[in-house]
Every structure is written in structure tokens, then in C-alpha cells.
Amino acid sequence: DDCGKLFSGCDTNADCCEGYVCRLWCKLDW
């Protein structure tokens, strides 16, 4: 659930990606 991890790989933290502003970072990571 740590959004911080999603910076290195949002694929492993899809839940966080869909959960909060981290979603934006997830898309940027693509």
C-alpha cells in the first residue's frame, strides 16, 4: 500500500495506483 514503491514499479502496486494521486505517477511511469 506504499505509494512510494509505485515509483519504481506501479505494476506491483496497482492497488495504490488506483487508490490515490499516485495514479498520476503510475501513468507517468509508463
From Swiss-Prot:
The presence of a 'disulfide through disulfide knot' structurally defines this protein as a knottin. It is found in: Secreted. Inhibitor of voltage-gated potassium channels of the Kv4/KCND family. Inhibition of Kv4.3/KCND3 and Kv4.2/KCND2 is strongly voltage-dependent, while inhibition of Kv4.1/KCND1 shows less voltage-dependence. Its binding site may be near the potassium channel voltage sensor. Also blocks calcium channels. GO terms for cellular component: extracellular region. One of its GO terms (molecular function) is calcium channel regulator activity. Pfam families: Toxin_12 (PF07740). This is Kappa-sparatoxin-Hv1b. Negative results: has no affinity for Kv1.4/KCNA4, Kv2.1/KCNB1, and Kv3.4/KCNC4. Expressed by the venom gland. It comes from Heteropoda venatoria (Brown huntsman spider).
